[in-house]
Structure formats: structure tokens, C-alpha cells
């Protein structure tokens, strides 16, 4: 049984200090959206088991943070974002080739509700009420921009108490009872493993594009990892942690 999700921490400083020569393996740096945390940890283990010479290093954060790191020149071999807009920016900047982008996962929006439903949340319309403690992601990241798009399309003047930097930080606050509810992804409800209740939101499907970077220091291994992400084994791992069938 999976443990409840913990806050996402920026992993690069700790993970990238070890060089390839020290491990004797080929290092592959993968940047992934925060909502992919549990999936990527499982995918990393499976890929390394199938490729013993590979040493996958994960950097997990909000998509906007990943974008800034890539544009800032950080080392990265494969990047996976939680929406097409961020990937399009990386394509436009020349960091990623458009013909190498593929959709590796899909998801949906959901409301994570604190156990016992202290805020009496029944749907997205309750985000207009002032008395519950409600949260969303920052509009700078996909889960936040999508939430605000839903408010706008439903004509809701949302009363929001906090905007979190990524979806895992938001989910953690709901799990710990700091918030009555927050708008997350369907997969986050699954990962929470009973620590929250979930209400699905009728919203457009969320698509996760992935691509190797032009500056990859290990392009052959990056291509292998991309092929793995599109394999049936990887897709099974993704559905096991709450992502939709692609």
C-alpha cells in the first residue's frame, strides 16, 4: 500500500553532485512535473532494472520551475511537463525539437477533500464560498492555471486562501487538515491512498508531453528512456498510480 504523498522537494542539488565516473554508470537527468512524482520514482526503478548501466537522476518540481531551470542552462536529458504550453516554450527556445515531443500520460482534474469533509464541499461551485479553507496551485503552474480556467468557465468568483507552488504541496495541506479542499489531479487522489476524498471535475483532459533535450549529454540513453516511457510496461505503471489510459 502506498503511503500518503509527501511534499515535493527540489532534488537537483543532492542528486547531481555524484558524477557518472563515481557510479560507473551512464547518468540520465530527467526533469518531471510534480504530479508525476510517484510514477517517475517507479519508472526510474524499472528502467534501471532493465538497463543496469543507467543511473537515472530525477528533478521533480512544478512545470514552470522546470522550464526556468532548462532555460537557465541546467543539465537535463529528458523533460516531462504537465501541459503543452510549457513544452511549446521549450520548443520555441530551441531546447527541444518539436518532432521529438510525445504525449506519455494523461490525467484529469479533481477536488481533494479533507477526510470528514469539514467544509461540506460538494463540487467546484463551493470554491465561491468564503467559510471553507480552500487552495489551488499557483496559476504559474498547470494545475493552477487549469483550476482558474474552470472557475472562469463556470462563472465562479473563487474565494481562495492559498496558492501553492506545485500540486504535491497543495495535496499535503489537504491531507494534513490545513485546507478543507484543493484542486489537484485525479492521480493525486489515488496516490493519497485514502488520506483524502476525491470529487472528479468535468474538465478537458490534461496531457503530459515528454522530450529529450537538444543539449542532452547522453542522447542515446535519452532516446531509450523516451522509448520506455511509451512502452506498455511504463503505461501500466502510470495507470497503477492513477493516470488515465493514454
Residue ranges of predicted features:
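Sec-dependent bacterial lipoprotein signal peptides
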Residues: 1-17
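Short, solvent-exposed coil/turn linker segments
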Residues: 3, 15, 97, 120-123
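Exported/periplasmic ABC-transporter solute-binding proteins
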Residues: 19-49, 55, 64, 68-71, ...
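Periplasmic-binding protein-like
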Residues: 76-81
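A short, gly/pro- and small-residue-rich
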Residues: 93-100
Amino acid at each position: 500500500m502506498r503511503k500518503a504523498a509527501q511534499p515535493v522537494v527540489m532534488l537537483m542539488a543532492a542528486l547531481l553532485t555524484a558524477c557518472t565516473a563515481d557510479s560507473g554508470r551512464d547518468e540520465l537527468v530527467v526533469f518531471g512535473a510534480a504530479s508525476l512524482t510517484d510514477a517517475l520514482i517507479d519508472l526510474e526503478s524499472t528502467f534501471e532494472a532493465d538497463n543496469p548501466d543507467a543511473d537515472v537522476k530525477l528533478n521533480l518540481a512544478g512545470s514552470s520551475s522546470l522550464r526556468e531551470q532548462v532555460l537557465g542552462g541546467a543539465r537535463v536529458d529528458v523533460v516531462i511537463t504537465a501541459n503543452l504550453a510549457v513544452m511549446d516554450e521549450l520548443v520555441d527556445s530551441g531546447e527541444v525539437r518539436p518532432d521529438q515531443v510525445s504525449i506519455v500520460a494523461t490525467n484529469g482534474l479533481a477536488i481533494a477533500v479533507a477526510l470528514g469533509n469539514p467544509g461540506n464541499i460538494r463540487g467546484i461551485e463551493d470554491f465561491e464560498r468564503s467559510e471553507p479553507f480552500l487552495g489551488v496551485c499557483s496559476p504559474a503552474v498547470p494545475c493552477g492555471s487549469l483550476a482558474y480556467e474552470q472557475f472562469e468557465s463556470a462563472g465562479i468568483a473563487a474565494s481562495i486562501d492559498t496558492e501553492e507552488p506545485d500540486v504535491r504541496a497543495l495535496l499535503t495541506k489537504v491531507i494534513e487538515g490545513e485546507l478543507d479542499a484543493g484542486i489537484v489531479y485525479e492521480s493525486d487522489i489515488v496516490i493519497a491512498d485514502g488520506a483524502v476524498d476525491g470529487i472528479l471535475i468535468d474538465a478537458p483532459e490534461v496531457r503530459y508531453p515528454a522530450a529529450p533535450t537538444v543539449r542532452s549529454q547522453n542522447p542515446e540513453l535519452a532516446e531509450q528512456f523516451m522509448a520506455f516511457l511509451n512502452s506498455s510496461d511504463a503505461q501500466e505503471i502510470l495507470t497503477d498510480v492513477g493516470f488515465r489510459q493514454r
